[in-house]
Design a protein with these regions (language model features):
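Helix-to-loop junction immediately C-terminal to a conserved catalytic motif
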Residues: 54
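Conserved ABC transporter NBD signature motif
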Residues: 62-73, 81
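Conserved catalytic motifs of ABC-family nucleotide-binding domains
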Residues: 161
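Conserved small/polar residues in nucleotide/adenosyl-binding loops
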Residues: 256-263
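Conserved ABC ATPase signature
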Residues: 140-144, 148
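Conserved ABC ATPase "signature" region
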Residues: 117-135
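Catalytic Walker B motif of ABC-type/P-loop ATPase nucleotide-binding domains
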Residues: 165-168
Length: 267
C-alpha cells in the first residue's frame, strides 16, 4: 500500500477575488505501516493535504496515486478510496448522531453495503480497539465524556477497516490527561493493526514520542520530511514559523553547549 503525491497544488477560490494557494508543488510518498506526524500552524496547508489524501478535495494540478492507481483517472472508484483512507476530522464528536454509541459505529460499515452481522462484528472490534468500556456501547453518545466521544468517533472510521487512518488534531479541546490517553490509544492501535496512521497536529510535543516520521508544512509547502531527530535539529528554523521543538530538544542543546564550554575551559 502506498499514497504518492506528485507536484500537487491546490488553490481555494480560483477565479474569484479571494484566491489562496493552499498547497504548492507538494510531492511525497506514504508507505504501508508508517506512523507519521503531519505538523504545521493554522493555515500551513496540513488540513487541505489530508483531504487531498482521500479524495475529498481534488488537486488543482498534480497527481495522487493510491496503490499504484491514479485517483484522478476517469473510472477510479472514489467511494472505495474513502473507505480505504479513513479521515477523522477535528472535533469528530460533532458528527455523532445515533441513539447509541454502537449504532453510530455501525453507520459506516452499513453505508458500505455490509450485512447486519458484519456491521455489528466490525463495530464490536472497533470499539474494543479504541478501549471503549463495554457498558458504554449502548449508551447515548451524548452522555459520554469528551475523550469517550473522541474514541467513539474514531471507532466509527476504524469499523470501515481503512488501510490508512488520518486523524486531524485528535486531541483538540481535551485536557492533558485526555490528550495523553487518546495518543496512547492511537499508538497501541497502530502497533496492534499495523494500519498506516497520519497524525495531524500543530504541536511537536504531542507527536514527538509517538511517530517515526514527521512532515512539516509551512505556507503550503513541505518544509521538512524526515525522522523526528533530524527535524528537531532544525529547531531554530521551526521557531521562525511558529513551531517549537519538544522540550527535550532544548535540554539536549543546552547540555551540549555546556559540555562544549567546560571542555574549552580545560584546554
Amino acid at each position: 500500500m502506498s499514497i504518492i503525491l506528485d507536484k500537487v497544488n491546490y488553490i481555494y477560490g480560483e477565479g474569484s477575488g479571494f484566491v489562496k494557494h493552499a498547497l504548492k508543488d507538494v510531492s511525497l510518498a506514504v508507505d504501508k505501516n508508517e506512523f507519521i506526524g503531519l505538523i504545521g500552524h493554522t493555515g500551513s496547508g496540513k488540513s487541505t493535504l489530508t483531504q487531498i489524501f482521500n479524495g475529498l478535495l481534488r488537486a488543482t494540478s498534480g497527481d495522487v496515486y493510491f496503490n499504484g492507481d491514479n485517483i484522478y483517472d476517469k473510472d477510479y472508484d472514489m467511494k472505495k478510496l474513502r473507505s480505504k483512507v479513513g479521515l477523522v476530522f477535528q472535533y469528530p464528536e460533532h458528527q455523532l448522531f445515533e441513539t447509541t454509541v454502537f449504532k453510530d459505529v455501525c453507520f459506516g460499515p452499513k453505508n458500505l453495503g455490509l450485512d447486519k452481522r458484519e456491521c455489528e462484528l466490525r463495530a464490536f472490534e472497533a470499539l474494543e480497539l479504541v478501549g471503549m468500556d463495554k457498558e458504554l456501547f449502548y449508551n447515548s453518545p451524548f452522555e459520554l465524556s469528551g475523550g469517550q466521544k473522541r474514541r467513539a468517533a474514531i471507532a466509527g472510521v476504524i469499523a470501515m477497516k481503512p488501510e490508512v487512518l488520518i486523524l486531524d488534531e485528535p486531541t483538540a479541546g481535551l485536557d492533558p490527561q485526555g490528550r495523553d490517553e487518546i495518543l496512547d490509544m492511537v499508538k497501541a492501535m497502530h502497533e496492534q493493526t499495523q494500519m498506516t496512521v497520519i497524525l495531524v497536529s500543530h504541536s511537536m510535543e504531542d507527536v514527538a514520542k509517538y511517530v517515526g516520521r514527521i512532515l512539516v508544512m509551512n505556507d503550503g509547502r513541505l518544509m521538512y520530511d524526515d525522522v523526528p531527530r533530524e527535524v528537531f535539529a532544525h529547531y531554530r528554523e521551526l521557531e521562525k514559523i511558529g513551531l517549537a521543538a519538544p522540550q527535550v530538544t532544548y535540554i539536549t542543546v543546552s547540555y551540549t553547549h555546556l559540555r562544549a564550554h567546560e571542555t574549552s575551559l580545560h584546554l
